[in-house]
Amino acid sequence: MLLGHAKYEGILQSTPAITVLHGEARFMNENCLTVQLAEGGERTVAFDRCLIATGASPALPPIPGLKGTPYWTSTEALASDAIPSRLAVIGSSVVAVELAQAFARLGSQVTILARSTLLFREDPAVAEAVTAAFRAEGIEVLEHVQASRVAHAEEEFILTTDRGELRADKLLIATGRAPNTRTLNLEAAGIEVNPQGAILVSHTMRTSAPHIYAAGDCTDQPQFVYVAAAAGTRAAINMTGGDATLDLTAMPAVVFTDPQVATVGYSEAQARHDGVETDSRTLTLDNVPRALANFDTRGFIKLVAEAGTGRLIGVQAVAPEAGELIQTAALAIRNRMTVQELADQLFPYLTMVEGLKLAAQTFSKDVKQLSCCAG
């Protein structure tokens, strides 16, 4: 809170040209909105340009009995001053897996109910590796399981599933985040949204109303703080006469579990969906010297190349330091490098990022037969 005040609220309040209104805004038309002020009353605001950056909130699945129970979202979980003996987690998203493992390591007996698999939008090998790691440390992962009813009695949650009842002291709902757009009356301003209510934006952050821009988790862009920051910067530039764009084709993403998950670019399935033929290789971490030195060879590095050209178009990694290597992969993709060009680069020995070079070498060599740092 102190950091937020110093970096944001304090700056806004100390800038004479900025007026801060606390309340709920609603569009009247494409050039005017009203604000129901928190202290009472209403104020009309006319504008030439508008930026919508209302963020997102935890989504609530329509499970009978859930409303009215003291369930947790990520907000309550992170604010808790006690560790539950038994924690049930509904969801398989990034937030679900990060918090599930955190509470397990703090001492909770954790059970995850995944409608599909963990991190189901990623390459299936990612889900398999994370699930195996979780189960190895005692986290129960129930795949293809949904709760059909939730009850709370005598300080205990009872979840009804097709595999029987599950009881827990606390229940964490982590099934994604919904954009905060429902009350904005966007249709009055001619602003289009997708079926989930996310505002559709172009690569310049413009909405379907040319003078209205949007950035962050309220849009149809990936919900990451660095994407929101980049989008907001570009929106501000364009709202003041500039011409800035945001290219997300090589956007890295990291899941902070242990081992970490890091991805950038295409997975095989995504490439196939877009009609791109691929050639892929997977290097297990027992072939990476740094992983051997760490005595932790859980995971892999997978490179996805465009068939025929060998151009690198995607990387998926599961490793204890996967997040530290993914930006190198992003730069390689951004610069349209082939896997052979990546394999020919010099990487420092005994670093995890060296695994990218080794993975690239597997397209033309058997790395098991190479010396420790063969070029």
Name each region found by the language model:
Residues K67-I83, E165-M239, E324:
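FAD-site-proximal beta/loop scaffold in flavoenzymes
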Residues A17-T19, S57-A59, E192-V193, G242-P252, ...:
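A short alpha-helix-loop-beta-strand transition element characteristic
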Residues A6, T19-H22, R26-A38, L106-H203, ...:
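A Rossmann-like FAD-binding core segment of flavoenzymes
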Residues M28-E30, T34-P70:
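Glycine/serine-rich phosphate-binding loop and adjoining beta1-alpha1 elements at the start
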